[in-house]
């Protein structure tokens, strides 16, 4: 099955032509270059530039380099059997990745330029490459300050299948940088995260103080947002716009309203007007400690809950000036002692020096084990083994209700009720339970945003109801006739019209690589797939798709360069090379696929390749492994039946053929082979029954052989 890239319509023209038609926050919402702030606020700007927020995003340069490129340039990642090298050439920074293939040769070599660094280095530094299309891709290797500074895999990549095409979404830059420019039209849901022109470097003043263009133009006479003068909720919203993430897991933890652009939130506005935050159901994953969970943990603390809105982020944190070391401990502990000096039980000695080490300890993040953060839960006793090292694990899918978390309570409005239903369905967490409410509310409200109908269509598809999915996607297209993403979705659930639908998609969105790719795969057209690659060569599935259609070794090599951890690409390589008689290389590829994911289908394909090389005993070993891995793989049972029959092991052969038929009763060729085996065993009646089934099948050649065998079985 072909998997299509997750991103929506790409405005895949060159970066420079996009600059003439951009949407920037400056032109829409009155933002300006924050360097102007330092003219009047020199001291504050200088202190802020040293904070983590001020150093959150930047181009790599000698002045901000903390890594030791000369001493430790290489890193080997054993889990994925891949090598990395970080290098500097002529003042430019690069990350190179490779593996070792047959005869010790380097394979799957990819080197990309590091255009930006995301992360101040307080917790980590992560490297971004900017594509010609203006997208940002996070490369797999990162740097962490632990143990004096060391290389390590980025979160989500310290696994057997690191992420080689981790695109940076708009929501990532929303919090890790100042306001960037994006192409006109990309404010809509599902738009690809394309950026235009030079990106700002670091979170700027306007993230908390709002648009500053008019303030600068009038030399300070026009007011800006002063968070300290907002209400308690308003002040918290300013912080929580970025620091609140109930979980990094696979739920809609921050559901942005569909009519809002990705950078449209203005400090001072109610955050709920921009997004609603969701959490797991009560009692599910309660004790997690995640990297971006500081505000989430803080809001669970007794100190916060019982303070009567007297405790907030600003009690401890001055965003303009972050203390370090002993000064930080003294400052934060002083805040604690405003309440707790007299509140401690009698006989408990309270030191003004340090409340933090015990009650807000450093902990490793569950979702980013290389990173260490402060625990804001403010617990009486520090959790055990808070800094113990552990291996990263792939997140487990969550199935169940997702519940509104912030604001609490969520205001009871029809629109908010609709978003609550969207949250159940949109990422597939609670589809069966959520769909009735989503359907009811949409019938009542008849929303005018196409995205609601995209969610509805996805829900019906998830439930196996293509008819209703078609109706939903068609309504999305009535509301937004040029929505190529809806056309692609419609083509998947209406295969009889898929070709004409996708032809329309590439007509209305000729620069959308995903439509060209889906169209090319449907029609087995190398030309259309190559068109998709030309529009955006960074979508990995396109190269594998081209190799599937053309059986080209060059396309296969490109697929594995783009993602050498794609087991499907390795398996495809094994099949292509087997066809060409290159068995040694083919078996290497099969073994790689199985090492990454030992699925029954990969083991079965390896067994077929071994048969082509006349290695029947080895083929039987792999076929048996395939059945152990996937007992429902009928083709593996069929193959085992043939291998047993070849050795004259008729009882075992019959058993495997029967297992295959039990799984797929209409396999005419298996009925034929089973009939032959049974006839050889002298079980004439049973043989005849299976031969008649084979004769009734749609395969003319099989039917002819079955009829011939039946004639031979007939009494003379």
Indicate residue ranges for each PLM-predicted region:
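Primarily the internal scaffold of c-type cytochrome electron-transfer domains
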Residues: 24, 28, 35, 43-119, ...
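Structural marker of alpha-solenoid helical repeat scaffolds
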Residues: 444-445, 479, 508, 535, ...
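Helix-start (N-cap) detector for alpha-helical repeat units in TPR-like alpha-solenoids
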Residues: 449-451, 484-485, 513-514, 540-541, ...
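Position-specific recognition of the canonical hydrophobic site in helix A of tetratricopeptide repeat
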Residues: 461, 495, 524, 551, ...
């Amino acid at each position: 099955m072909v998997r299509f890239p997750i991103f929506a319509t790409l405005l895949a023209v060159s970066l420079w032509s996009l600059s003439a038609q951009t949407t920037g926050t400056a032109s829409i919402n009155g933002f300006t270059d924050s360097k102007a702030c330092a003219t009047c606020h020199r001291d504050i700007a200088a202190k802020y530039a040293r904070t983590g927020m001020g150093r959150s995003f930047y181009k790599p340069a000698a002045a901000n380099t903390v890594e030791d490129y000369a001493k430790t340039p290489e890193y080997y990642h054993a889990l994925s059997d891949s090598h990395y090298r970080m290098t500097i050439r002529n003042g430019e920074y690069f990350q190179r990745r490779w593996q070792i293939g047959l005869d010790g040769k380097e394979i799957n070599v990819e080197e990309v330029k590091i255009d930006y660094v995301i992360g101040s280095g307080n917790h980590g530094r992560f490297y971004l490459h900017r594509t010609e299309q203006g997208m940002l891709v996070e490369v797999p290797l990162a740097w962490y300050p632990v143990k004096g500074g060391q290389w390590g895999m980025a979160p989500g990549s310290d696994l057997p299948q690191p992420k080689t095409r981790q695109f940076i979404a708009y929501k990532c830059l929303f919090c890790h940088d100042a306001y960037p420019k994006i192409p006109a039209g990309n404010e809509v849901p599902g738009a690809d995260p394309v950026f235009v022109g030079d990106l700002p470097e670091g979170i700027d003043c306007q993230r908390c103080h709002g648009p500053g263009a008019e303030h600068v133009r009038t030399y300070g006479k026009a007011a800006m947002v002063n968070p300290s003068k907002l209400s308690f909720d308003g002040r918290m919203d300013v912080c929580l716009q970025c620091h609140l993430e109930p979980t990094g897991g696979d739920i809609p933890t921050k559901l942005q309203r569909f009519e809002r652009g990705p950078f449209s939130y203005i400090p001072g506005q109610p955050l709920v007007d921009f997004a609603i935050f969701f959490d797991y159901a009560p009692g599910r994953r309660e004790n997690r400690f995640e990297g971006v969970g500081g505000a989430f943990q803080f809001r669970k603390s007794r100190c916060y809950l019982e303070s009567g809105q007297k405790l907030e982020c600003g009690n401890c944190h001055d965003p303009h000036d972050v203390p370090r070391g002993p000064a930080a401990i003294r400052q934060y502990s002083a805040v604690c002692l405003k309440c707790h000096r007299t509140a401690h039980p009698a006989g408990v000695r309270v030191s003004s020096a340090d409340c933090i080490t015990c009650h807000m300890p450093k902990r490793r993040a569950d979702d980013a084990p290389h990173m260490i953060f402060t625990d804001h839960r403010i617990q009486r006793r520090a959790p055990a083994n808070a800094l113990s090292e552990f291996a990263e694990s792939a997140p487990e899918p969550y199935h169940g209700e997702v519940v509104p978390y912030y604001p609490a309570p969520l205001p009871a409005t029809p629109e908010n009720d609709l978003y609550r239903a969207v949250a159940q369905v949109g990422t597939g967490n609670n589809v069966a339970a959520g769909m009735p409410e989503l359907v009811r509310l949409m019938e009542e409200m008849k929303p005018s945003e196409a995205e609601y109908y995209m969610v509805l269509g996805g829900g019906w598809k998830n439930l196996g109801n293509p008819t209703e999915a078609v109706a939903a996607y068609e309504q999305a297209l009535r509301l937004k006739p040029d929505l190529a993403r809806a056309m692609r979705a419609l083509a998947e659930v209406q295969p009889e019209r898929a070709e004409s639908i996708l032809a329309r998609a590439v007509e209305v969105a000729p620069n959308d690589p995903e439509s060209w790719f889906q169209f090319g795969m449907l029609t087995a057209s190398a030309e259309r797939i190559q068109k998709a690659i030309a529009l955006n060569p960074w979508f990995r599935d396109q190269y594998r798709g081209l190799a599937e259609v053309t059986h080209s070794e060059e396309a296969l090599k490109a697929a594995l360069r783009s993602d050498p951890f794609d087991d499907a690409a390795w398996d495809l390589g094994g099949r292509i090379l087997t066809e060409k008689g290159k068995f040694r290389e083919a078996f290497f590829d099969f073994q790689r696929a199985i090492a990454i994911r030992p699925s029954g289908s990969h083991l079965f394909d390896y067994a077929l390749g071994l048969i082509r090389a006349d290695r029947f005993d080895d083929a039987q070993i792999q076929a048996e492994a395939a059945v152990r891995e996937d007992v429902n793989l009928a083709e593996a049972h069929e193959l085992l039946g043939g291998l047993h029959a070849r050795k004259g092991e008729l009882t075992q052969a019959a058993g495997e053929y029967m297992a295959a038929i039990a799984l797929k009763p209409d396999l005419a060729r298996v009925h034929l082979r089973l009939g032959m085996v049974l006839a050889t065993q002298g079980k004439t009646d049973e043989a005849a029954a299976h031969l008649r089934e084979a004769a009734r099948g749609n395969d003319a050649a099989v039917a002819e052989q079955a009829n011939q065998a039946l004639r031979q079985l007939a009494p003379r």
